Amino acid sequence: MGGHSHWATVKRHKGAMDVKRGKIFTRIIREVTIAARSGADPDGNPRLRLAILKAKEANMPGDTLKKAIQRGTGELPGVLYEEFHLEAYGPGGIGVLMEITSDNRNRTVAELRNLLTKNHGNMAEAGAVSWQFHKKGLLTIEKGKVDEDTLLSIALDAGAEDVKVGEKLFEVLTDPHHFEAVKKALADAKIETALAEVTFVPQNTVKLEEKAAEQMLKLMEVLDEHDDVQKLHANFDISDEVMEDRKSVV
């Protein structure tokens, strides 16, 4: 996956687990509800605007989306979710950053600590891992979809910070404030993105070999299955060869 690999990219290699589990709606509903606390008008609420876009891309029914917004604004009763980050270490000292939405912080922390302990990981103190990540807009494009010079010109003109060339993908990195402008510029140029999100990108990555890679992927899958984990980030890199070997047995 060239340079650094993102958990979201690894998940696509594995067959979009979220979709199969039906978790994607749950996550988007929580994101919409929380975003709507800052106002129901997407024009004045960038976070809600992005959440609504995700909901539409996932073909969420309009009524479901409307109710999620109304729960956020207080028009409808709903669960009060708290947002927070948890930090952990995986096999080989890999840093893991978890974005959480929970209606019971103590329960969530206890459950995730238990999952970590059972899967070659452990909880870290606040700040121990987060410094290893930068918040960035990330857009990936399959290399066959566009030539490098065209992508560079469009992305950088729209405000992108960098374009990285991987083995199979281009990765466009932006400041979070310029993410929407870059995404729109690519869409206007009919350049299809495989992934487009504001995420936490590792400053550096640690390459994992077969056993540690297998343990790390298993840990990430287990954490990802927890209902309160909205997003996962980790600073590991796994070669395409290891991923291909794993796909053949998954």
Residue ranges and their predicted role:
Residues 249-250:
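Conserved small/polar residues in nucleotide/adenosyl-binding loops
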Residues 107-181, 189:
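Glycine- and Gly-Pro-enriched alpha-helical subdomains that act as flexible
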Residues 51-52, 90-100, 131-144, 164-168, ...:
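Short, hydrophobic beta-strand segments
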Residues 237-246:
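Short acidic, Gly/Pro-enriched loop/turn segments at secondary-structure junctions
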Residues 175, 196, 203-238:
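Cytosolic regulatory modules rich in charged/polar residues
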Residues 1-124, 129-138:
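N-terminal cationic and glycine-rich segments that engage phosphates or anionic surfaces
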Residues 149-154, 180-217:
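Strongly charged, low-complexity linkers/loops
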